[in-house]
């Protein structure tokens, strides 16, 4: 579960490495996989597509909290990770690193197609 002031890893090659959650767009106090959040970049690599301190939207692709599926299986990851997106929902980077949990159907198909592994 992600809430305000959570430090997250970035799972794409947009140039950001760490971001801070500064707002939730789902109207609740916490967000999970597939939710869109507002983030501020904290750690960036030189000559990347993003700048330090700028505000972006991001979709959550991995959470540490165990998520139960309908068939009874449980999935949890070792880190909280996001992919930076633009206003249309397309990713800013061209690659997505690490596994990605299935996102809501039709909303982030571009992010899922770039992922190495979809669980």
UniProtKB/Swiss-Prot annotation:
GO terms under cellular component: cytosolic large ribosomal subunit
Keywords, comma-separated and alphabetical: Ribonucleoprotein, Ribosomal protein, RNA-binding, rRNA-binding
Domain of life: Bacteria
A Gene Ontology BP annotation from the UniProt entry: translation
Gene3D superfamilies listed in its UniProt record: Ribosomal protein L14 (2.40.150.20)
Gene Ontology molecular function terms on file: large ribosomal subunit rRNA binding; structural constituent of ribosome
Family matches, as SUPFAM superfamilies: Ribosomal protein L14
InterPro entries per UniProt: Ribosomal_uL14, Ribosomal_uL14_bac-type, Ribosomal_uL14_CS, Ribosomal_uL14_sf
CDD domains, A to Z: Ribosomal_uL14 (cd00337)
Protein family according to the UniProt entry: Belongs to the universal ribosomal protein uL14 family.
Job description of the protein: Binds to 23S rRNA. Forms part of two intersubunit bridges in the 70S ribosome.
HAMAP family, per the entry: Ribosomal_uL14
Subunit structure, interactors included: Part of the 50S ribosomal subunit. Forms a cluster with proteins L3 and L19. In the 70S ribosome, L14 and L19 interact and together make contacts with the 16S rRNA in bridges B5 and B8.
Protein name (Swiss-Prot/TrEMBL): Large ribosomal subunit protein uL14
Originating species: Ehrlichia ruminantium (strain Gardel)
């Amino acid at each position: 579960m992600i809430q305000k002031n959570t430090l997250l890893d970035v799972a794409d090659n947009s140039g950001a490495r760490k971001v801070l959650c500064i707002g939730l767009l789902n109207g609740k106090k916490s967000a999970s996989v597939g939710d869109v959040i507002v983030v501020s970049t904290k750690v960036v690599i030189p000559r990347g597509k993003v700048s330090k301190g700028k505000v972006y939207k991001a979709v959550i692709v991995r959470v540490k909290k165990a998520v139960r599926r309908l068939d009874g299986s449980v999935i949890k990851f070792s880190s909280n990770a996001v992919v930076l997106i633009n206003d249309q929902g397309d990713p800013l980077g061209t690659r997505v690193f690490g596994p990605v949990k299935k996102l809501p159907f039709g909303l982030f198909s571009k992010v899922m197609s770039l992922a190495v592994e979809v669980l």
